[in-house]
Structure formats: structure tokens, C-alpha cells
Amino acid sequence: MSKKSENQPCMVCGEISYSIRFGAVSCRACAEFFRRKIVSKARIPKRCNGACDLGKYHRKTCQSCRFQKCLKIGMLEKVVASRTPVNRRSENNQTILSGLEKAYDKLENSRDNVFDRKNKIPKYCNHQELDDMFEIDIKLISTHFIQFFESKSSLENNQNKVLSTHFIIRFSLLEVAFRAFGKPTYILPNNDIIDVSKLDKVYQHLETGEDERGKNSQVILQRFWQMNEKTMKTEVFPVNLDQSEFLFLCALIYWDFGIENQSEKCLEECQRMRTQVLKELTEYEKSNYPENELRVAQVIGILQALQKTLDVIQHSGYISNVYNLKGKQCPLYEATNE
């Protein structure tokens, strides 16, 4: 995979490197990133203007820019292909991560089509648009992403339903946070945005603008948005997940335990799959972080922050119904009560 070079900075992130890997001077982490992307053949989503800063402390911020820089400095796809044995390639395709990447790619493609994201100009999202968008997106998630988990299940349909119902809202909250890494606003699955500092955009009337009920809704619910924002900024954003880590967390969320109405067989299957996911996550972090045990703990710690966010959503949903506030019919509120 590599040959020795003089002590030079990695041409992707600037980390000190002693090797030429896949045709260019690069550190071990960037070379492994490049290899994984070539082997998996998964689409790399682009959520930026193509000019992200990729210093050694920020190289995981944007996969798209990192991959393009790998190509720009001369890293060769054909070298990866020529050095990947047939049996190794087959083994990689059978990992949970590779299956998750393909399923998530299908979900993103379906969103491109349904929401016309390639031609859409992002805008602030009103509460009614937010409700409509999540109602559509939940169906897309069920069809294109949850299908992967169910394909690995030996459970009866009612137990698959228990897991998928538990998964939907947690996945949606985690994904919105993941899309917001390094950005000042929350980016929704249809590419519209929510800015916590401009909640009037959320609660205003879709056609006429401001109205009294919208103002009341904003005043009452603002603290819930702020509580959620604090959790994100202090516990989630600093971890700076990459897409693979995000997908591993998705798997841990789906194969959870202690869920209401979960059968003994379902619990055993979830524990078995979680063990496999954690094994893959640990191996993944070993190739990226010298202190990989700490990184694994940081990634898994996001699940606790996610539970805090879920609690905030449940409370705001209850308040919205009691006071008949705008947004009370949001599908995410309904999902927290199932």
C-alpha cells in the first residue's frame, strides 16, 4: 500500500507523513479513508460549496472535499483496486457498514427525487412545511433505510414494527444533528433550514406572515429549542462524526434493548447485532485514531445526548397539545408517543 518518503506533511490534511500511499504523500488516516471509499463504491454526499478547510484537526468535517482532495493530489483509484484481493473485497461487502452505506445512499437518492433537492433553493422552513416534510420523509426512511435492518431480521413482523417505531424519531433527530456539523443552521432532509435564532420563521403564517398564535407558540416553545441547541453544541457537535460513525450509531439505535413490547427473542437478536456493530466500530476507529478507545466512547456517548434531545421533544409536544400551539401535529411528536 505504501513506500517510504521523506518526512513530509500529508497533502490532504497536513499531518506528518513518512509514506507515499496510493500514489501521493498522505497520512495513514487519509489513505485508509480513500481506500474505504473506493472499495465501498458508496456515493459521497456533498453538503458544502467545495471549499472546506481540511486541516489535521478538521479532516473529518467534509467527506466530499476530503475525497476530492485525495484525487486532486494524485491518489489513484486503480491502485486501490489492484491491491484489494477478491476474497477481501467480498468480505468487505458483507460488513454491516457497507450495507448501511448502500441503504443510506438509496435513501438519499429517493430524497433527491421526491424533494427535487438538486434544483431546490434552500429556505427557512415554516412549521406546516416541516410537518409535511417529515410525514413524507418518514415513509422514505421506512422504505429505503429500515429495509436494510429488516433484511437481517429473523423476527416476526410485529417485533420488526417495535424496532422501526422506536428507531424513526431517534434517527431523524440524529440525522438533522449530523447534517448540522460545522454549520450555523439545521439542515433538513429536503435541504430547507431552521435557525434557532430566527424561530419567527418557523411559527409565522405560511401565507400572511406573522399572527398572534404564531407569536405565542414561539414564546412558549423557544426554551425547548434553546435546550436542544445547548445539548447539540456541548455534547454532539464537538464529536464531529463522520458518515461511517453516524451510520454505526444508526445501527445501535435500531438494535436497541429495553424497548417497550420487545420480546425475548428480539432482545437476543438485538444484543447479538449490537456486538457485531461495536466490533466493526472499534476496528474502524483503530484505523483512524491512535486513541481509538476514547474515540469509541465519544461516539457512543452521543446516544445519551440523543436521549436528552428526545426528552425535550416529548415535553414540547405535550406543551404544544395542551396549549394548542402551532406545530402540535408534527409527525415527530406523534412518534414519541407510540
Curated annotation (Swiss-Prot):
S-S bonds = none
Pfam families reported for this sequence? Hormone_recep, zf-C4
Name this polypeptide is given:
Nuclear hormone receptor family member nhr-108
Segments forming NR C4-type zinc fingers: 10-30, 46-65
Q: Which InterPro entries does the protein's record reference?
A: NHR-like_dom_sf (IPR035500), Nucl_hrmn_rcpt_lig-bd (IPR000536), Znf_hrmn_rcpt (IPR001628), Znf_NHR/GATA (IPR013088)
Name the gene that codes for it.
nhr-108
Instruction: Report the GO molecular function annotations.
Output: DNA-binding transcription factor activity; sequence-specific DNA binding; zinc ion binding
Q: Where in the cell is it found?
A: Nucleus
Q: Which residues form the NR LBD domain?
A: 92-338
**One annotated GO biological process:** regulation of transcription by RNA polymerase II
Q: Which family does it belong to?
A: Belongs to the nuclear hormone receptor family.
Cellular component, GO annotation:
nucleus
DNA-binding region ranges: 7-82
Q: Which UniProt keywords apply?
A: DNA-binding, Metal-binding, Nucleus, Receptor, Transcription, Transcription regulation, Zinc, Zinc-finger
**What PANTHER family does this protein's entry cite?**
NUCLEAR HORMONE RECEPTOR FAMILY MEMBER NHR-86-RELATED (PTHR46011), NUCLEAR HORMONE RECEPTOR FAMILY-RELATED (PTHR46011:SF17)
Organism, scientific name? Caenorhabditis elegans
